[in-house]
Amino acid sequence: METPNPLTLSELPHDLLRNIFNRLSFADFHRATWNSISKQTAPPKTKSPWLILFPDEGVHGCVLYNPDEDRIYKSVRDFSGTIFLANSGNWFLVMDSKSNLYIIDVFSENRIDLPPLESLLSDNFTFEQKGDKELKWQASNDQILVFRLPRAEELRGILWVDEKMKEFVAVWFLEDSCNFLAFYKKADDHYSHIQLEYVITDVFQSVSDIVLHGCFLYIGVGDYIQIIDLSKDQGFKDVTRNYLFNVHNGPWGFRSIFNLVVTTSGEVLMVLNNLYEKNIESEKSFRIFKKDPNPDPNKHDNLLVEVDSLGNEEVMLLDLGITMHGIEPNSIYFTRHDRVVHRLYIS
């Protein structure tokens, strides 16, 4: 009697396939997206953000931790010498051991190579690679020339990926003492320089915080917030005047630690971090402020009002500077000294 040939996955009844896909973990479901039935099945809902961990300081790559499953996933890729600069969902902006930038999907083999750093277009700045780990950054105008030799490890970045629209924006900058930023959009063959308020006079005034939300870039520099629209076909547009937001009009001291956060609706929040002054269990470990929607025209010091709740549907990812729907509503996720604190309620 002949043994019947086993059915392949694609030959199983559609109802059975849907039942199988509904039982898969998030990572297994993602690997099964080649099947047409999986695309008709809602992916597993996650209640908590995944964590990317770097054992041995990243020497042997990274692992992904899913709090919902209490499970660690090890990447099959070799990430030796790779520096992870930023992420947007499962897409990561990384720099390899030769200071090349690219974007990868950590759940697949998808990779997008970015132009070399030397492709920067700017009237005042140049960037040059000096060996595998050293860079040369130079700023100049008609009167002065300034240059630095930063290490590759000083490069920082932020990333925004819209998988539905198949669009992405990557921004990179130096960690310390530089008001310099550059960005790249899909299909460009170079990086474009983003001009901040000062070119040379305050060239060593560092960026205090930066958030990328869609094609809008929010930059905290000195005592103001600059807002850049990167959606243009060529270059960008400074729309700061449409969003006046002075950081000195809040109830914090000179040395206070604050973060910029942009909500799903595009509203800018200031988050005052009191964790270095108060116990982490304190109800006021964080204080959140927004621009007063009804300011007193006769006063100049009441432009910010405190926010008591993020709402029933939003959660704040403080490290990314954004809010999003779902997960654990009205909560803040953040990292502090490499220790992750989960579900800190603010109301």
Swiss-Prot record:
It holds the Pfam family F-box. PROSITE patterns: FBOX (PS50181). Residues 6-52 form the F-box domain. Transmembrane segments: none annotated. This is F-box protein At2g14500.
